[in-house]
A protein has these predicted regions:
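Short, low-complexity N-terminal intrinsically disordered segments enriched in polar/charged residues
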Residues: 1-28, 125-130
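A solvent-exposed, acidic/Ser-Thr-rich amphipathic alpha-helical stretch
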Residues: 4, 20-73
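Hydrophobic pocket/interface hotspot
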Residues: 10, 22-23, 30, 43, ...
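Hydrophobic/aromatic beta-strand elements that line small-molecule binding cavities or substrate pockets
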Residues: 64-70, 82, 96-102
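Generic short beta-strand segments
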Residues: 79-85
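Active-site neighborhoods of divalent-metal-dependent phosphate/nucleic-acid chemistry enzymes
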Residues: 86-88, 92
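Low-complexity, intrinsically disordered terminal/linker segments enriched in charged
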Residues: 110-130
Length: 130
């Protein structure tokens, strides 16, 4: 297996909502695909925009941790743990997921996320009055 330290830096940029740092890991025509939502961002600018908006539209204290990263010359995979507070409702969330992708010449050409959005929706749903 290859060096996985770049995965730690990549995911640290997620937590920092540093869209430019996230996008810098991608080839100019790279793709971020959330298979479970589904949505797809193509190119560095749309990927950077997505990660810059996270703190202002969803959660200012969003945090990701990496587990079990693996990487070689042309692919990678890791598990992640996402925690934070959904700003609009004040509800905490705690989600696990996995990512994998394809690398070319040291840059991500296609990133895939897999997780359970229904779990997130249930955790951030506003409490109803009795």
């Amino acid at each position: 297996m290859g060096d996985t330290s770049w995965i730690e830096m990549f995911v640290a940029a997620w937590s920092a909502a540093d869209g430019d740092a996230v996008a810098a890991h991608f080839a100019p025509d790279g793709v971020w695909e959330d298979v479970t939502m589904p949505f797809r961002h193509e190119g560095r600018a749309p990927i950077a925009d997505m990660w810059t908006r996270v703190p202002t539209e969803f959660s200012a204290d969003s945090h990701f941790e990496v587990a079990n990263p693996v990487s070689d010359a042309d692919r990678y995979a890791f598990q992640w743990h996402w925690t934070g507070t959904h700003d609009p409702t004040g509800r905490r969330y705690d989600i696990r997921g996995a990512s994998m992708g394809v690398v070319r010449e040291g840059l991500i050409v296609h990133h895939y996320d897999y997780w359970n959005p229904a779990q997130l929706a249930a955790q951030i749903r506003p409490e109803t009055e009795s």
